[in-house]
Amino acid sequence: MSARKGYLLPSPNYPTTMSCSESPAANSFLVDSLISSGRGEAGVGGGSAGGGGGGYYAHGGVYLPPASDLPYGLQSCGLFPALGSKRNEAPSPGGGGGGGSGGLGPGTHGYAPAPLDLWLDAPRSCRMEPPDGPPPPQPQPQQQQQQPPPPPPQPPQPQPQATSCSFAQNIKEESSYCLYDAADKCPKGSAAADLAPFPRGPPPDGCALGASSGVPVPGYFRLSQAYGTAKGFGSGGGGTQQLASPFPAQPPGRGFDPPPALASGSTEAAGKERVLDSTPPPTLVCTGGGGSQGDEEAHASSSAAEELSPAPSENSKASPEKDSLGSSKGENAANWLTAKSGRKKRCPYTKHQTLELEKEFLFNMYLTRERRLEISRSVHLTDRQVKIWFQNRRMKLKKMNRENRIRELTANFNFS
């Protein structure tokens, strides 16, 4: 038996130190030989007939079922290696005299219930280290003589020395990460900072980011960024609003043209409006020119060019029917008379009168009474009208200087 134990290798299915044979031929040989020898020695030592189909050992109180009733793993591993291990021990103090002839029959230290605890089919992914010594024998009660064979083995509880094969921690992190995504509207700084290095898929519905990166940023920064983009491009002045409104949405800058991507998707009328808006606005010509002298000279030259071109008459300017003509002249006149808000401008001076007044304003912002009377006679206006125009022009220049100064101050800061 010792040679047999040395020859057999440990089974990969049973994490024990006992040697088990995998082949059915070796199992049947071990079972038959040991049952016959055990029955004979038990009958001699105990003085009782050990025959029969079940194989009772009277001195030890152990019932040995036939080999055909034993499931796989109990034939050679569960019971009979213990017989060989008890060969050199002292005779067990059994009730019927004990198996004193060789100790082949299992005595009170019955080893039959051991397969319920040790030789169970453990999971293949989790292997247990073999213990150092054989497991201690368990006492067998006397009432198990009439019990049927042991039930099929139950799955074992996870052993502390088994290697971790499940991914419970990863699943926990994934669930917390999903909760972090769901609670995107009210994230906590610590949780967002802890979960930042994890990879991220497409953003959820609550996130309003246009193009999210592969790594999620902390929640406070992401919310502010999403809020800004949603305000700037989603609802502020997008292409859909340009298509829906009759007049294109005006950007904050003065000389800002709509991007070509938005202009390509707009209608023909919106395209014409964009072309008209890209030209220098003649509102400065009607009520006053730019802030500096160079700007005023440029506005004066543009006014002169418009005056030399075939401009519409005063009647066409006054009548809204001729302003809505489909020709380019009618559109220019309508753009010149119509403010960006859609209302008609109040322009009491003609282009020639405005040009002459702008020229005089370039030379001198404050007029004497004699010079004012001369200008009023040249442009066919009253003295009071010229005085009021110069007052309004000075106020407009002051306002434009203030706006230019604010724009220059804010241009030094890069908010991108």
UniProtKB/Swiss-Prot annotation:
Cellular localization per UniProt: Nucleus
Pfam family, one: Homeodomain
Superkingdom of the organism of origin: Eukaryota
Tissue specificity note: Expressed in the developing limb bud where it is restricted to the mesenchyme along the proximal-distal axis. Also found in developing gut and urogenital tract. In adult tissue, both forms found in kidney but only isoform 1 is expressed in skeletal muscle.
GO biological process, one term: male gonad development
Chief localization: nucleus
Keywords: Developmental protein, DNA-binding, Homeobox, Nucleus, Transcription, Transcription regulation
GO terms for cellular component: cytoplasm; nucleoplasm; nucleus; transcription regulator complex
DNA-binding region: 342-401
Database matches in SUPFAM superfamilies: Homeodomain-like
Gene3D superfamilies from the UniProt entry: Homeodomain-like
Record field: compositional bias (Gly residues): 40-58, 93-108, 231-240
Annotated region described as Disordered, given as residue ranges: 40-60, 81-167, 228-345
Biased composition (Low complexity): 300-314
Molecular function terms, GO-annotated: DNA binding; DNA-binding transcription activator activity, RNA polymerase II-specific; histone deacetylase binding; RNA polymerase II cis-regulatory region sequence-specific DNA binding
Bias (Pro residues): 131-140, 147-159
InterPro entries for the chain: HD, HD_metazoa, Homeobox_CS, Homeodomain-like_sf, HXA10/ABDB-like
Cited function: Sequence-specific transcription factor which is part of a developmental regulatory system that provides cells with specific positional identities on the anterior-posterior axis. Binds to the DNA sequence 5'-AA[AT]TTTTATTAC-3'.
SUBUNIT field: Interacts with SIRT2; the interaction is direct.
Family: Belongs to the Abd-B homeobox family.
Protein name: Homeobox protein Hox-A10
Source organism (scientific name): Mus musculus (Mouse)
The organism's taxonomic lineage, starting at the top: Eukaryota, Metazoa, Chordata, Craniata, Vertebrata
